[in-house]
C-alpha cells in the first residue's frame, strides 16, 4: 500500500463489508473486508515537495455515499464510496505556506470538519493565515465556516 519511507498509521474504516484505508502517498483504497481483494484505488494527489509524503496519515471518514480524506498537502476530497471516483477536491490550507495534514476529517451533524497541522510553520506575514478548523458541505465541498483556534489581532 505504501512505497514511501514515511510512517503508515491509517485507522481502517469499515462500512458494509468494505475496508477503506489511506496512506502517506495520498492513495485511498477500498478492499473487500472478507477476501482482502482490492475493489478500487484512487491516487488523490502525489505527495508535494516532500519525498515520501509529509508524515503519517491516520484517519478518513464516511457519510452517506462518500469517503472523506485529506491529503498531506492539505486538500480535502469527497470520494464516491462505491466507485472510488473523486466527487470534489478543495484546498483547505496552502501547503506552500506550511499547511498539511496527518489526521483526517470527522463528520458532525452533517458537516465535514477538518483541522490542519502546520500552524507553527505558516508564514506570519500572511494576514489571512493562522490556525483554524473548517467545516464543509459533504455533497459539494463548499466551505461552510472557519474557526480560528488562536485569536488573531482584532478577534
What are these regions (language model features)?
Residues 134-155:
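Extended catalytic-interface subdomain
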Residues 21, 69, 114-115:
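Residue position within the beta-strands of beta-propeller blades
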Residues 16-18, 64-65, 109-111:
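Short coil/turn segments that connect the beta-strands within blades of beta-propeller domains
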Residues 1-13, 41-64, 89-104, 148-155:
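Extracytoplasmic beta-rich repeat domains
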Residues 114-131:
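Short, conserved, GDST-rich strand-edge loop motifs in beta-rich repeat architectures
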Residues 32-35, 80-83, 138-140:
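Short loop/turn segments that connect beta-strands within beta-propeller blades
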